[in-house]
Amino acid sequence: MTTHHSAETASTPHPHGFATKPRAMTSERTRIKICGLTREQDVDAAVAAGADAVGFVLYAPSPRAVTPERAAQLARRLPPFVTPVLLFVNESATNIAAASAMVAGAIVQFHGDETPADCLLATGHGLRPFLRA
């Protein structure tokens, strides 16, 4: 009798000790974010190249910085399935909430010394999706 092992039944190990979906049955896809865009033609090129997300830097000291108003203007060029990402560095929760309200569907990315509590406060306790870099 021959025993056959199939990749369809092999579980992928999980770092917390339990198995995830079988390897052959999952489809992995890398999402691409292009960040630091400041011009319409760059946003259009990122979308044409297949970017899944486009980032706008709202940190004034950065050479790639844009204002919240400019980020909103550029984000309006994005098609429905390209996600706008607003990048902040040590910004106040009030300013993050105000800027986020200007860009429909935006995800917030924290790139400073923000604590988990700071991230939750600035995103309405997680009502707006966020990333911590």
Predicted regions and their residues:
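Intrinsic low-complexity/disordered segments
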Residues: 1-2, 11-13
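Conserved N-terminal beta1-alpha1 strand-loop-helix module at the mouth
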Residues: 2, 21-133
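Short hydrophobic alpha-helical segments enriched in small aliphatic residues
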Residues: 5-6, 15-19
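Short, linear, compositionally biased motifs with a strong N-terminal bias
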Residues: 13-16, 24
